[in-house]
């Protein structure tokens, strides 16, 4: 499917692809997709949505646009990835589309906002339900300092003819689907409700499909409860979603906690305007029990075998990225900024890994927005390959041809009176494993 612009691209059973054909000029908006289309194996369009807004930018022929960005979901699948018994429909059904509209809301700022909206679109391409993020600002729990920063600078982007504030920047959206919490009587987790995350505000929340109101949230403040403090600051996150009920961990929430920069607060040395005020130079993948508000599984630099915080940035993608729970209980992680996709077991062993060799033309990086694993049967046009196990290299002993043998030294002597290092007290920075004085 050469030339498609899906962000993400999602393969459906039968060899179909849900994607987009391009973007609006960056002079006039930010990350506005022209349309959302479903194409077959031969590239024929079998479904299309673009009638969100008619756009007539200067010097460009007017046209209808979806203004889609970052995510979409087809009825039948809550997350867009494989879960037993939860296949997306390919010839019918509604589609949730994450999109943009410009907005004004003096409660947030006197500046124009690039607002996130969720559109439910039927098979005929008609919008049958919609939700507007800015209308629920009062439900999000911003403190006074972050509100003041937002009012001054709602993540301003210098578009024409008037700039706009990409104030929330929702980057994932999915339906909860059947789950054990709702089965136990917790209405916050109604199967029709929708979970989203806003990377610019460091917030994850669930929307009631019936009322539009926020029923559950984590952030933007992580100092307001013992549970939030224990989880720790989630910064610039991506791909928050509820694990489908037919997969291990069903009902828990997965999120790629990027770190990097995100959130609004009072100005500080790392964020002199108060925008992107929280900073961290490593990433975490978290699985959270949304009722107990506790981390039940994680993959962080510590689980990856790196000494934190000194070596934490060896697992780090400050933007994009995601993860997928697999039927075998493993987790497929996209460390997006480096184009790395790898599968880890519940006890954090890497059992499969891929690094993209492809770099972009205009952005010379091998970044990968979000990877998905699908069953071979979903793409019947391609013969099922023979899987071959590969023994992982031991990088501590591996040598390229012609290099000296491991451990080969000209001479080794002992010096009388030398004392060995004892623990991490040899380092200038305390590790996360060092005990704190309580």
Regions inferred by a protein language model and the residue ranges of each:
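Histidine-/acidic-rich catalytic cores in large beta-rich domains
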Residues: 1-438
């Amino acid at each position: 499917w050469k030339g498609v612009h899906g962000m993400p691209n999602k393969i459906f059973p039968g060899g179909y692809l849900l994607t987009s054909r391009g973007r609006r000029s960056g002079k006039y908006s930010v990350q506005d997709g022209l349309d959302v289309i479903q194409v077959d194996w031969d590239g024929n369009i079998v479904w299309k949505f673009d009638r969100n807004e008619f756009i007539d930018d200067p010097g460009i022929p007017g046209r209808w646009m979806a203004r889609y960005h970052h995510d979409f979901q087809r009825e039948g699948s809550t997350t867009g990835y494989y879960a037993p018994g939860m296949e997306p429909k390919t010839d019918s059904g509604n589609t949730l589309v994450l999109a943009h509209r410009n907005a004004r809301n003096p409660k947030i700022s006197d500046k124009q906002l690039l607002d996130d909206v969720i559109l439910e679109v039927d098979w005929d391409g008609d919008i049958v339900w919609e939700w507007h993020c800015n209308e629920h600002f009062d439900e999000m729990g911003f403190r006074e300092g972050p509100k003041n920063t937002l009012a001054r600078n709602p993540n301003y982007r210098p578009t024409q003819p008037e700039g706009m504030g990409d104030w929330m920047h929702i980057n994932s959206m999915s339906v909860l689907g059947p789950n054990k919490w709702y089965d136990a009587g917790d209405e916050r987790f109604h199967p029709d409700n929708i979970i989203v995350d806003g990377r610019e505000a460091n917030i994850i929340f669930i929307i009631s499909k019936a009322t539009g109101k926020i029923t559950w949230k984590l952030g933007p403040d992580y100092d307001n409860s013992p549970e939030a403090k224990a989880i720790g600051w989630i910064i610039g996150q991506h791909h928050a979603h509820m694990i489908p009920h037919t997969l291990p961990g069903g009902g828990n929430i997965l999120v790629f906690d990027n770190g990097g920069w995100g959130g609004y607060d009072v100005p500080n040395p790392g964020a002199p305007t108060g925008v992107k005020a929280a900073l961290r130079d490593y990433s975490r993948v978290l699985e959270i029990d949304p009722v107990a508000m506790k981390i039940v599984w994680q993959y962080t630099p510590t689980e990856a075998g790196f000494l934190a915080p000194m070596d934490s940035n060896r697992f780090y993608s400050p933007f994009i990225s995601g993860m997928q729970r697999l039927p075998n209980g493993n987790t497929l992680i996209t460390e997006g900024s480096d184009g790395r996709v790898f599968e880890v077991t519940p006890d954090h062993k890497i059992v499969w890994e891929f690094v993209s060799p492809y770099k972009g033309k205009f952005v010379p990086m091998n970044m990968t927005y979000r990877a998905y694993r699908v069953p071979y049967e979903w793409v019947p046009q391609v013969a099922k390959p023979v899987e071959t196990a590969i023994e992982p290299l031991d990088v501590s002993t591996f040598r390229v041809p012609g290099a000296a043998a491991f451990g080969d030294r000209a001479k080794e002597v002992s010096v009388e009176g030398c004392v060995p290092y004892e623990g991490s007290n040899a380092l200038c920075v305390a590790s996360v494993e060092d005990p704190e004085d309580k």
